[in-house]
Amino acid sequence: MKVKDFDFYLPEELIAQHPMEKRDEARLLVLDKETGEIEHKIFKDILDYLTPNDCLVLNNTRVLPARLIGSKEETGGKMEFLLLKRKEKDVWETLVKPGKRAQIGARFIFGNGELEAEVIGMGEEGSRIVKFYYEGIFEEILDQLGQMPLPPYIKEKLDDKEMYQTVYSKEEGSAAAPTAGLHFTEELLKKIEEKGVKLAFLTLHVGLGTFRPVKVEDIQEHVMHSEYYKMDKKTAEIINDTKENGGRVIAVGTTSCRTLETIGDIEGKVGEQSGWTDIFIYPGYKYKVVDALITNFHLPQSTLLMLVSALAGRDNIMNAYNVAVEKEYRFFSFGDAMFIK
């Protein structure tokens, strides 16, 4: 299959620039993956589509305020750092702009000097290996000095950092939010549990590979970036019990989906596990664990659009996306949602 098979026309004004004031009042497009039938709802109506045997699998990762603005110690020139991946306690793989000023040995200052950094090596695809120096707790300093690493298509400033976190976020480490989860409120989750639906949590730390375009014509040649995941015993048991009792495993977001499919065996069973995944799901892939998916609307020609096409069929997805454009749904990270059932 070619990348161009996953292209669609999207007017720029449909790219959501800010989150909904009430998380669960975004719109919801419901797509039947067997028939291609479409319904138009509000996100909190998701309750009507869940049954007591089902389980929702949610990614409890928390976004780091990983964008730091600092200056070069030697010249005072302004620099932008984006933390990608922790390598050791105070050593990170980092994107640094402008890169030409970030040679090995270069030092940088952030805030009033409470955080300093030195480039100690070169990473993949132009990234830098950076060691940070500070007194106190790194996460607290980052919280104070860092900004949310919003995707490049969001131009507006985010007033409240928590609006780019899910209400159940817990495990710090992502460079982007698992955006399907942004639609849930604590009240909606409570109602879902009261209905007898099980909630199961796993962790996948979202990397910037999520936003990287596919640069090859033939999708099979694309290589994914690896991301860290973990699933505990309790979550594995909930998922296996759901399968045994004839319920559906409903992934909340493509990150939960990719984690489940990484861990699942040929029979759809999962177990306690952690590691790095670079799974690339595209049409032709047979899902082992995931029965249904809650997800946002993705970028044209993106790996995430290919993932949903593998679940519902490319024609069904492309048709649903064209309908969503026609009906002026809001797209991407702060946009509306889709339930593939």
Swiss-Prot record:
> Where does it localize?
Cytoplasm
Associated pathway: tRNA modification; tRNA-queuosine biosynthesis
Cellular component GO terms, alphabetical = cytoplasm
Quaternary structure annotation from Swiss-Prot or TrEMBL = Monomer.
The record's EC number reads 2.4.99.17
Describe its function: Transfers and isomerizes the ribose moiety from AdoMet to the 7-aminomethyl group of 7-deazaguanine (preQ1-tRNA) to give epoxyqueuosine (oQ-tRNA).
Q: List the GO biological process terms.
A: queuosine biosynthetic process; tRNA wobble guanine modification
User: Which reaction does this enzyme catalyse, per its entry?
Assistant: 7-aminomethyl-7-carbaguanosine(34) in tRNA + S-adenosyl-L-methionine = epoxyqueuosine(34) in tRNA + adenine + L-methionine + 2 H(+)
A single Gene Ontology MF term assigned here is: S-adenosylmethionine:tRNA ribosyltransferase-isomerase activity
Q: Does the keyword Transport apply?
A: no
Q: What is this protein called?
A: S-adenosylmethionine:tRNA ribosyltransferase-isomerase
Q: Which family does it belong to?
A: Belongs to the QueA family.
What are the alphabetically sorted keywords of the record?
A: Cytoplasm, Queuosine biosynthesis, S-adenosyl-L-methionine, Transferase
Q: Which Gene3D superfamilies match?
A: QueA-like
